[in-house]
Amino acid sequence: MEQKYIVAIEIGSSKIKGAIGSIDETGTLTVLAVEEEKVLDSVRYGCIQNVDMVCNAVSQVVSRLEQDPGIAPRKIKSVYVSVGGRSLSSVIVNESTTLPDETEITEYIIEQIKYKVKTTAIADRDVIDVVPCKYFVDKQMVPNPVGVFGQTLTAKMNLIVCKPQIKRNINRVLCERLPFAIAGYIVRPVAIADIVLTDNEKRLGCMFVDFGAETTTESIYKDAVLQYIATLPMGSRNITRDITATNCIEEKAEEFKIAHGSAIADGSAKKTTADGV
């Protein structure tokens, strides 16, 4: 059986990251290579501002991935793209359908509802993903409606949305300037939460915070599903720029932050001296 490969690109405010992995016959994914390229001011708050600069950075990342011994001489043709940014948020939509008497609900019926919800017009927003929250069959809540018989099915869906400019500029970079097809969009905070959070944490309820360079995304989980997403226009670069007030350039401030900073307070005061500050 021919091995399958999957490529993902993340276009962040501080760097462009790319990863390629192989999928074996059991569906197991093995990461083969990861590359990144720093960007400065060409992506702001998760939205591409300078298409040419981002195009060059993505091209370099992909070129290095293709040169990896585990990949060469294969060429990358399509990629999955991570989506985040200041405009990322969620909208709750309820959709109902009436079925013939005593109809067994199937995956096909569920997918029809999801498709209808995904094509819902949201003012000044593009729908990236649809996350089911709750299902009701004949007004009774059921965790999984597949296999249940009923006459009415109501779905409470969480639409993950962003400004059209996000996807439009991604398309300009990857499909118009570069020779790639977009295999799909991945909601970055949701993908990270699926890796970090346990099933119990999602079921009992928690808030997951994705702290980026210029944005911070908060995701609320309850009853094992995503309930809410909101994004704040601030991130780790705010800390870096505070450090530049000590009369050092941003690159040095970033290095100092990474070397000496900690997100977890240990209760003890520490004094650090940096040369030239």
Task: Place the predicted regions along the sequence by residue.
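Nucleotide/phosphate-binding catalytic cleft detector across ATP-hydrolyzing
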Residues: M1-K15, A19-M207, V225-Q227, S236, ...
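Glycine-rich phosphate-binding loop of actin/hexokinase-like ATP-binding domains
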Residues: L204-A245
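Glycine-rich nucleotide-phosphate-binding loops and adjacent flexible coil segments
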Residues: R241, E251-E255
